[in-house]
């Protein structure tokens, strides 16, 4: 079973980190600058859905 690695980016310092790195601190914060606003990095794969 492959585990999908979820990546996040800090909106202040711009560093990319994983969920396991984020769990070092209590709450949801950047492990490098302690900023609270983070964004989940989107997958580069495009999902196409057929039109009806």
Swiss-Prot record:
GO CC annotation, single: cytoplasm
Database matches in SMART domains: RPOLCX
Superkingdom of origin: Archaea
Keywords: Cytoplasm, DNA-directed RNA polymerase, Metal-binding, Nucleotidyltransferase, Transcription, Transferase, Zinc
GO biological process, one term: DNA-templated transcription
Residues that coordinate or bind Zn(2+): 13, 30, 33
Cofactor(s) demanded: Zn(2+)
Enzyme Commission number(s): 2.7.7.6
Primary localization class, coarse: cytoplasm
InterPro entries to which the protein is assigned, alphabetical: RNAP_P/RPABC4, RPABC4/Spt4, Rpo12
GO molecular function per UniProt: DNA binding; DNA-directed RNA polymerase activity; zinc ion binding
Entry keyword annotation includes rRNA-binding: no
UniProt feature coiled coil, ranges: none
Entry's family note: Belongs to the archaeal Rpo12/eukaryotic RPC10 RNA polymerase subunit family.
HAMAP family listed in its UniProt record: RNApol_arch_Rpo12
Functional summary from the UniProt entry: DNA-dependent RNA polymerase (RNAP) catalyzes the transcription of DNA into RNA using the four ribonucleoside triphosphates as substrates.
Protein name (Swiss-Prot/TrEMBL): DNA-directed RNA polymerase subunit Rpo12
Gene responsible for this protein: rpo12
């Amino acid at each position: 079973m492959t585990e999908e690695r979820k990546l996040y980016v800090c909106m202040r310092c711009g560093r990319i980190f994983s969920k396991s790195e984020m769990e070092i601190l209590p709450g949801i914060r950047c492990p490098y600058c302690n900023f609270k606003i983070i964004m989940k990095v989107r997958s580069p794969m495009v999902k196409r859905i057929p039109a009806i």
